[in-house]
Amino acid sequence: MEAIGVLMMCPMSTYLEQELDKRFKLFRYWTQPAQRDFLALQAESIRAVVGNSNAGADAELIDALPKLEIVSSFSVGLDKVDLIKCEEKGVRVTNTPDVLTDDVADLAIGLILAVLRRICECDKYVRRGAWKFGDFKLTTKFSGKRVGIIGLGRIGLAVAERAEAFDCPISYFSRSKKPNTNYTYYGSVVELASNSDILVVACPLTPETTHIINREVIDALGPKGVLINIGRGPHVDEPELVSALVEGRLGGAGLDVFEREPEVPEKLFGLENVVLLPHVGSGTVETRKVMADLVVGNLEAHFSGKPLLTPVV
C-alpha cells in the first residue's frame, strides 16, 4: 500500500502520522505553501483523505481529487465532511465512534464540578497565597441537581449514567423520544432548559442544531443555571452566551469547544464562573491511540477490499 496517496489535512496525532507514513504515501496538506497548486499536481495520486473535526473534506476538495475513494475522519463528528458530495461521488466515509465516549463524558462531569465548586478559582486562590487571609467563599453542590442533556446518543447517555451516580434527576431533548430509557423527555430545548439546573450539549452539529443554544434557551436556564458544551462550538450563539454571563443572566458555563477555535471571546477570561478548555474532550493518550488505529484500520480495510470497520457512507 506504500504507493497509495493519503492526504492528511492538518496536524493530529503524532502516532497517527507515523502509522500512516509507514503504510502509505503520506501528503501533509498543512505544510504546503501553495495548496491549490499542490492539489493540481498530486490530484491523480491521492486516493484517501484523513481529516478531523477542524479540517475534513469539503465539496471543493472532493471535486479537486478525481481519484478519491475514502475519507477517514479522526473524530466522531463529521461536520467538516460534505457527506452529500461523498455520496454523489461514491466516496466512502468513516469516523471513530464509541472509542472516545468515556473520555468526553468524564470531561463533562469534570466541567460540571469545576464550575459549581469553583475548582479552578480555588486552585488560583491557594497559589496566590490568599488562603492565609481567609477562607474561600462557599460554592454550590452538584449532587441532586437536575441535569438536562441535549442529544441522548452515545456520549449523552454516558453523561447521564455518570450524573445518576450523583443522584441527579435526568431529562433530555433529542430528535425523538428514546424507547429504552426512563429519563424524562422534553419536546423542546427551551422546555428542557426551564426544567434543568445544568444543561449539557452533547448532540451532533447539523444545520438544525447550529445555535441550538440561543438567548431564549439561556434565559430559560436562568441566573442559577449552568451550561456545559462538549459538543461543537457552533451549537452555542456565543455572543448571546457572553452577554448572559457578563450580565448575570446565566449562572455559569463549562466550555470545551468554541465557535471560531482557537479564538475565544476575551470577555470570558475574567469570569470566575466560567471554565474554559482547549477542545480536549477526547484528548487522552489512550483514546487518541485507539482512534488512530481505527483510522488506519479503515484505510487498510478499504484498500484490501474488506468491509470498513466504522462506515458512515
Curated annotation (Swiss-Prot):
Keywords on record: NAD, NADP, Nucleotide-binding, Oxidoreductase, Pyruvate
Catalytic residues, chain numbering: 232, 261, 279 (proton donor)
Molecular function via GO: glyoxylate reductase (NADPH) activity; hydroxyphenylpyruvate reductase activity; hydroxypyruvate reductase [NAD(P)H] activity; NAD binding
Enzyme category, top tier: oxidoreductase
InterPro entries associated with the record: D-isomer_2-hydroxyacid_DH, D-isomer_2_OHA_DH_cat_dom, D-isomer_DH_CS1, D-isomer_DH_NAD-bd, NAD(P)-bd_dom_sf
Domain of life of the organism encoding this protein: Eukaryota
Binding-site list for NADP(+): 152-155, 174-176, 230, 256
Pfam family, one: 2-Hacid_dh
UniProt-listed SUPFAM superfamilies: Formate/glycerate dehydrogenase catalytic domain-like (SSF52283), NAD(P)-binding Rossmann-fold domains (SSF51735)
Catalytic activity from the UniProt record: (2R)-2-hydroxy-3-(4-hydroxyphenyl)propanoate + NAD(+) = 3-(4-hydroxyphenyl)pyruvate + NADH + H(+); (2R)-2-hydroxy-3-(4-hydroxyphenyl)propanoate + NADP(+) = 3-(4-hydroxyphenyl)pyruvate + NADPH + H(+); (2R)-3-(3,4-dihydroxyphenyl)lactate + NADP(+) = 3-(3,4-dihydroxyphenyl)pyruvate + NADPH + H(+); (2R)-3-(3,4-dihydroxyphenyl)lactate + NAD(+) = 3-(3,4-dihydroxyphenyl)pyruvate + NADH + H(+)
Gene Ontology CC terms, in alphabetical order: cytosol
EC number: 1.1.1.237
Main function: Catalyzes the NAD(P)H-dependent reduction of 4-hydroxyphenylpyruvate to 4-hydroxyphenyllactate and 3,4-dihydroxyphenylpyruvate to 3,4-dihydroxyphenyllactate in the biosynthesis of rosmarinic acid. Rosmarinic acid is an ester of caffeic acid and 3,4-dihydroxyphenyllactic acid. NADP is the preferred substrate.
Family: Belongs to the D-isomer specific 2-hydroxyacid dehydrogenase family.
PANTHER family: 2-HYDROXYACID DEHYDROGENASE YGL185C-RELATED (PTHR10996:SF178), 2-HYDROXYACID DEHYDROGENASE-RELATED (PTHR10996)
Protein name as catalogued: Hydroxyphenylpyruvate reductase
Organism: Plectranthus scutellarioides (Coleus)
Gene that encodes it: HPPR
